[in-house]
UniProtKB/Swiss-Prot annotation:
<dbReference type="GO" id="GO:0075523">
    <property type="term" value="P:viral translational frameshifting"/>
</dbReference>
<feature type="short sequence motif" description="Nuclear localization signal 1 (NLS1)">
    <location>
        <begin position="124"/>
        <end position="139"/>
    </location>
</feature>
<feature type="binding site">
    <location>
        <position position="108"/>
    </location>
    <ligand>
        <name>Mn(2+) 2</name>
    </ligand>
</feature>
<feature type="binding site">
    <location>
        <position position="80"/>
    </location>
    <ligand>
        <name>Mn(2+) 2</name>
    </ligand>
</feature>
<keyword id="KW-1190">Host gene expression shutoff by virus</keyword>
<keyword id="KW-1104">Inhibition of host RNA polymerase II by virus</keyword>
<keyword id="KW-1035">Host cytoplasm</keyword>
<comment type="subunit">
    <text>Influenza RNA polymerase is composed of three subunits: PB1, PB2 and PA. Interacts (via C-terminus) with PB1 (via N-terminus).</text>
</comment>
<keyword id="KW-0255">Endonuclease</keyword>
<dbReference type="InterPro" id="IPR037534">
    <property type="entry name" value="INFV_PA"/>
</dbReference>
<dbReference type="GO" id="GO:0042025">
    <property type="term" value="C:host cell nucleus"/>
</dbReference>
<dbReference type="GO" id="GO:0004519">
    <property type="term" value="F:endonuclease activity"/>
</dbReference>
<dbReference type="Pfam" id="PF00603">
    <property type="entry name" value="Flu_PA"/>
</dbReference>
<dbReference type="InterPro" id="IPR001009">
    <property type="entry name" value="PA/PA-X"/>
</dbReference>
<keyword id="KW-0464">Manganese</keyword>
<feature type="binding site">
    <location>
        <position position="119"/>
    </location>
    <ligand>
        <name>Mn(2+) 1</name>
    </ligand>
</feature>
<keyword id="KW-0945">Host-virus interaction</keyword>
Length: 716
């Protein structure tokens, strides 16, 4: 074959092909078919460009080389055949002068008439298969693809063949001649069968010196050098090999690897049952705040003082009554607990000096609500050794719940903007080194996008409640301490605001281990009528406690004010994580940064400013039954933040399991989208693992529903 190449092709082409193979560390004497393929490709590129010029009027003309007018501008810039550094220099220069988008891979030609890069393909296989491989590798609509075959077929982007019929016929004739010459020498079959699919790695990294010796030393047994190992890996067909290995390991294991196709995956099955209910530690979209602006009262900053001041802003209190009972609870006790709280707050106000903290009287209703004396008595294991039928008590299987629309509404609300600013600019850590000015610029842009987001309010509320509850749990272990649920923010005009959402009363809290539970009763204000979505409020007893005057378009309207009361519990470890909810800001900032980095590496400059300031550009936010939802960069920031915050608010073993297992399916689907031909075994087992996490948790059910939307659109 090498001899044929030297006879058949122009010496300049042969020399360029030798250089190219040397640059990629390939041996022309061993890889003779590749040598022939490179020469053929080079010749087609040169023939494509030959005789094509642009005249002074900017029109494309064909001129034979001995014509005196041959000083005209060449229509095509040849990039193929140059060494890599030079080729990229040419590409960059073209991009700078013409404004063309820089390609990710080195193209073969640039067409000055059509102002586009061209990728030339010469294939021994079907043209459309090779075309799709090229298109999939390049992933750019800006680069024009033109494929020729040795059988006279061709294919080009949008059937735009660039050249006139005669020029293309010359190329096809030459390819047909090469094929016939090879066939007459008995070389064609080997050459035809040796074509491999389009490689997506555009350059082979050459390892030399110490690193090369280390690589040779660290090979698996039976491999003498890195090249042999590379050849083995390149030609490795994993599926049959893995099946064989598995069957050797155990007679029970029988893993038949099945191809994963567009029709393979089915939707995740969501459970049937009554609708799921709200399980967050505090109200989210339904919360109501009693607020004071520019607080300057005595003791400002002391929670109890702030709470009393906020309570005084409301004048519509009325005799409370139960509007939505808690099915399993003693509802009069919840009502009595609220009345007790009001009475004890009144007592404080009547005192000369308001105390810094308030411990509630241990009344029967609070003892019941806080589970006092309800825990089974702990017995030392040594005292039970002799009991023959000792066993752990049976616990009921959790009841399956179905997805309900309220959790999607909660998420949508969390992504929205409020009319207050919840974090200062310095909330997300400080710069450590001067090199981080880009980091601080990104952080400031990001903070500006999320500082008014409702998810950010949830962060600050969560941090406050968990900090206060953990402090009280340690400082007043035996007391039923009253903890106001407070947050602080600024108005858009910069005025400070203190907000009261309601109160928590904590139970006994002798927390030795991280997982020991402290019970608490939460009482939270709201304007949401629980009768609209009773299933959401299954765990709550809801009282009507007053009437609030609200400004509306038609003047002042009176709306009933509700109090959502429930018994809840948390642990040291949960409170510790709750106190660190600000991490959600950091996590979503890092996700945004990776988007900016990807954009910057394509454009080869920092794109932070353009990323945040180009308001016209939209970005993918997520999947919905309608398709891929898009929005502004601010919306993307807020959506990512809301996801992170909900992962914290609704943290659970179900979420951990679903995230870990569904990720495996996601990776397989993404591999399919990238045409990597993935194979799977025991896909049914993976679905089982995913679906056993779908029990009753609203956030997990919503994520599963989103995942199904993604599957639908990803596999179209």
């Amino acid at each position: 074959m090498e001899e044929f190449v030297r006879q058949c092709f122009n010496p300049m082409i042969v020399e360029l092909a030798e250089k190219a193979m040397k640059e990629y560390g390939e041996d022309r004497k061993i890889e003779t078919n590749k040598f022939a393929a490179i020469c053929t490709h080079l010749e087609v590129c040169f023939m494509y460009s030959d005789f094509h010029f642009i005249n002074e009027q900017g029109e494309s003309i064909i001129v034979e080389l001995d014509d005196p007018n041959a000083l005209l501008k060449h229509r095509f810039e040849i990039i193929e055949g140059r060494d890599r550094t030079m080729a990229w220099t040419v590409v960059n220069s073209i991009c700078n002068t013409t404004g063309a988008e820089k390609p990710k891979f080195l193209p073969d030609l640039y067409d000055y008439k059509e102002n586009r890069f061209i990728e030339i393909g010469v294939t021994r296989r079907e043209v459309h298969i090779y075309y799709l491989e090229k298109a999939n590798k390049i992933k750019s609509e800006k680069t024009h693809i033109h494929i020729f075959s040795f059988t006279g077929e061709e294919m080009a982007t949008k059937a735009d063949y660039t050249l006139d019929e005669e020029s293309r016929a010359r190329i096809k004739t030459r390819l047909f001649t090469i094929r016939q010459e090879m066939a007459s020498r008995g070389l064609w079959d080997s050459f035809r069968q040796s074509e491999r699919g389009e490689e997506t790695i555009e350059e082979r990294f050459e390892i030399t010196g110490t690193m090369r010796r280390l690589a040779d030393q660290s090979l698996p047994p039976n491999f003498s050098c890195l090249e042999n190992f590379r050849a083995y890996v390149d030609g490795f067909e994993p599926n049959g090999y893995i099946e064989g290995k598995l069957s050797q390991m155990s007679k029970e294991v029988n893993a038949k690897i099945e191809p994963f196709l567009k029709t393979t995956p089915r939707p995740i099955k969501l459970p049937d049952g009554p609708p799921c209910s709200q399980r967050s530690k505090f109200l989210l979209m339904d919360a109501l705040k009693l607020s004071i602006e520019d607080p300057s009262h005595e003791g400002e900053g002391i929670p109890l003082y702030d709470a009393i001041k906020c309570m005084r802003t409301f004048f519509g209190w009325k005799e409370p009554y139960v509007v939505k009972p808690h099915d399993k609870g003693i509802n009069p006790n919840y009502l009595l607990s609220w009345k007790q709280l009001l009475a004890e707050l009144q007592d404080i106000e009547n005192e000369e000096k308001i105390p810094r903290t308030k411990n509630m009287k241990k009344t029967s209703q609070l003892k019941w609500a806080l589970g006092e004396n309800m825990a089974p008595e702990k017995v030392d294991f040594d005292d039970c050794r002799d009991i023959s039928d000792l066993k752990q008590y049976d616990s009921d299987e959790p009841e399956l719940r179905s997805l309900s629309s309220w959790i999607q509404n909660e998420f949508n609300k969390a992504c929205e903007l409020t009319d207050s600013i919840w974090i200062e600019l310095d909330e997300i850590g400080e710069d450590v080194a001067p090199i981080e000015h880009i980091a601080s610029m990104r952080r400031n842009y990001f903070t500006a996008e999320v500082s008014q987001c409702r998810a950010t309010e949830y962060i600050m509320k969560g941090v406050y409640i968990n900090t206060a509850l953990l402090n009280a749990s340690c400082a007043a272990m035996d007391d039923f301490q009253l903890i106001p649920m407070i947050s602080k923010c600024r108005t858009k005009e910069g005025r400070r605001k203190t907000n009261l959402y309601g109160f928590i009363i904590k139970g006994r809290s002798h927390l030795r281990n991280d997982t020991d539970v402290v019970n608490f009763v939460s009482m939270e204000f709201s304007l949401t009528d629980p009768r609209l979505e009773p299933h959401k409020w299954e765990k709550y007893c809801v009282l009507e406690i007053g009437d609030m005057l609200l400004r509306s378009a038609i003047g002042q309207v009176s709306r009933p004010m509700f109090l959502y009361v429930r018994t809840n519990g948390t642990s040291k470890i949960k409170m510790k994580w709750g106190m660190e909810m600000r991490r959600c800001l950091l996590q979503s900032l890092q996700q945004i940064e990776s988007m900016i980095e990807a954009e910057s590496s394509v454009k080869e400059k920092d794109m932070t400013k353009e990323f945040f300031e180009n308001k016209s550009e939209t970005w993918p936010i997520g999947e919905s039954p309608k398709g891929v939802e898009e929005g502004s960069i601010g919306k993307v920031c807020r959506t990512l933040l809301a996801k992170s915050v909900f992962n914290s608010l609704y943290a659970s073993p179900q979420l951990e399991g679903f995230s870990a297992e569904s990720r495996k399916l996601l990776l397989v689907v993404q591999a399919l989208r990238d045409n990597l031909e993935p194979g799977t075994f025991d896909l049914g087992g993976l679905y089982e693992a995913i679906e056993e996490c779908l029990i009753n948790d609203p956030w997990v059910l919503l994520n599963a529903s989103w995942f199904n939307s993604f599957l639908t659109h990803a596999l179209r």
